[in-house]
Regions:
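Acidic, metal-coordinating catalytic segment for phosphate/diphosphate chemistry
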Residues: 2-17, 132-137, 141
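A cross-family kinase active-site recognition segment
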Residues: 248-312, 334, 362, 433-437
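Active-site acidic catalytic loop and adjacent metal/ATP-binding pocket
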Residues: 32, 174-190, 195-196, 321-370
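Conserved Nudix-box catalytic region and its N-terminal flanking loop in Nudix hydrolases
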Residues: 14-16, 21-71, 77-83
Length: 456
């Protein structure tokens, strides 16, 4: 089984065809277009592979296509033709102003489904959407922002908070991204730019706004403090804190960032109970052995693996449990983990770094956070980042202990992050599970790590 969301490097070699699914406000009809003697959904194409969550790109194009003011709710169908390098997607839209124009062309979905040029995968998705409309039942794991009416409520809250903060009038609210785990808007006001973020309530996800409010007090130079919070709904409003360092930034800048984060982790190791009380997820190493067997037996996860890979995981299970005990026996303490630490989630500020996007904030072994060092393919860059990061730890702990912990964590990080993705995949609706069903990728990294340890 293959995940359709695997990373494709040559995005420009692809074509993306996007269909607009705009329901009639009161009748079982959808907006349609005529062309070449047939009826179809309004559609457009891009000469690249477009991420389905890129609402910043998609919304203006879809508004022009439909001649309507719309919100993008979610996609209802997705099809990839890898041989032809074409991606097809149907996005469900919500009409913002409810206005109907005399020249609008509305048709029953059955008429649309007569379009044989539309891939069969899209037909299946449209049929499922129609069944959902007829039943009136919404999948319980659907993201809130994929539901009608959510955008209006969020925008009212944003405008209320901007007024409360005395930031002047709201000039625009622009969608940036919307996918299965979060939704982000850019808010332009008379006095500057703000950002709104809504996050899902999922296993191992924190209430990000509440956690940031606490971390921002502990580390005011390193963590942004929300300007406004709605914890019950997972909403927060943040200042625009500038452009991220970026994955293509200079290696020495990234190395300094890793070293700075190591020092934050070392300090956090003295504040574990307070961090847990603030809402960070408790993922201390002791829990890992109990997660191994359920993970390796989870069909949603292992269905992407070959039979020999599944067998290798089962054979490795006792060894992995022993490695966990080895890591526990070393003196490196548990600490604060970001969960997705890379230069794209960091802002450079003079002599300090600001870390954002903390939905995965947790307490566990600090080295598990260094996935982008462990997975770095450039050996020279990898060594630079590794040595700079570890140098901070070696100021406090014996070099032999630090190096052994790094060696073991270089295998077990795959287990930690596979469990993270397993929980996410089970927490979102089946339609969008492929977006984040990447536990199998980290299981392969886990097997690579086991093999490397055996060869050393």
């Amino acid at each position: 089984m293959k995940n359709p969301f695997v990373i494709i490097l040559n995005m420009s070699d692809w074509t993306t065809v996007v269909y607009a699914l705009l329901p009639h406000p009161s009748q079982p009809l959808v907006l349609a277009q005529r062309g070449s003697g047939k009826v179809s959904l309004p559609n457009l194409s891009y000469d690249e592979r477009v991420w389905v969550g890129n609402t910043r790109l998609l919304k203006p194009s879809l508004e022009k296509l439909t001649a309507a003011s719309i919100n993008i709710l979610h996609y209802v169908a997705l099809h990839l033709d890898e041989e032809m390098q074409r991606m097809y997607c149907v996005h469900l839209l919500e009409n913002r102003d409810r206005a109907l124009f005399s020249n609008d062309f509305w048709q029953p979905l059955e008429k649309i489904l007569e379009d044989n040029d539309m891939p069969s995968g899209l037909h299946r998705g449209l049929n499922s959407w129609q069944e959902e409309q007829q039943s009136g039942l919404t999948p319980e794991r659907r993201a809130p922002w994929a539901l009608p009416g959510w955008h209006a409520r969020a925008e009212r809250w944003i405008m209320d908070q901007v007024m409360r903060l005395e930031r002047g009038a709201v000039q625009s609210i622009e969608p940036i991204k919307s996918w299965s785990i979060s939704c982000v808007f850019k808010v332009a006001t008379e006095t500057g730019v703000l950002y709104f973020k809504a996050s899902r309530e999922l296993p191992f996800f924190v209430n990000e706004g509440s956690v940031l409010a606490y971390l921002g007090k502990l580390y005011p130079e390193r963590v942004p403090v929300p300007l406004a919070l709605e914890p019950e709904r997972g909403w927060m409003l943040l200042d625009d804190f500038g452009d991220p360092l970026g994955r293509d930034s200079a290696v020495d800048q990234q190395a300094r960032m890793m070293q700075d984060f190591a020092r934050l982790q070392i300090d956090s190791s003295q504040k574990i109970e307070a961090l847990l009380a603030a809402g960070c997820t408790d993922r201390r190493i002791e829990s890992l052995p109990t997660q191994i067997d359920p993970l390796f037996e989870d069909e949603l996860v292992v269905s992407f693996l070959a039979e020999e890979e599944r067998s290798a995981l089962q054979e490795a299970a006792p060894r992995l449990k022993a490695l966990t005990a080895d890591l526990l026996a070393l003196p490196i303490p548990v600490a604060l983990l970001h969960g997705d630490l890379h230069a794209g989630n960091v802002i450079r500020r003079d002599d300090s770094f600001l870390y954002f996007d903390w939905t995965d904030a947790a307490i566990s072994h600090p080295f598990f956070d260094m996935i982008h060092i462990f997975m770095e393919e450039d050996d020279t860059k990898k060594l630079t980042l590794q040595e700079t990061y570890l140098s901070a730890w070696e100021e406090h702990y014996a070099k032999a202990d630090v190096r052994r912990a790094w060696e073991v964590a270089g295998t077990l990080y795959g287990l930690y992050h596979a469990v993270s993705y397993q929980k996410i995949a089970h927490g979102i609706e089946e339609l969008v599970q492929p977006e984040l069903n990447f536990a199998y990728y980290f299981l392969r990294k886990l097997l690579e790590g086991v093999k490397k340890l055996e060869n050393n």
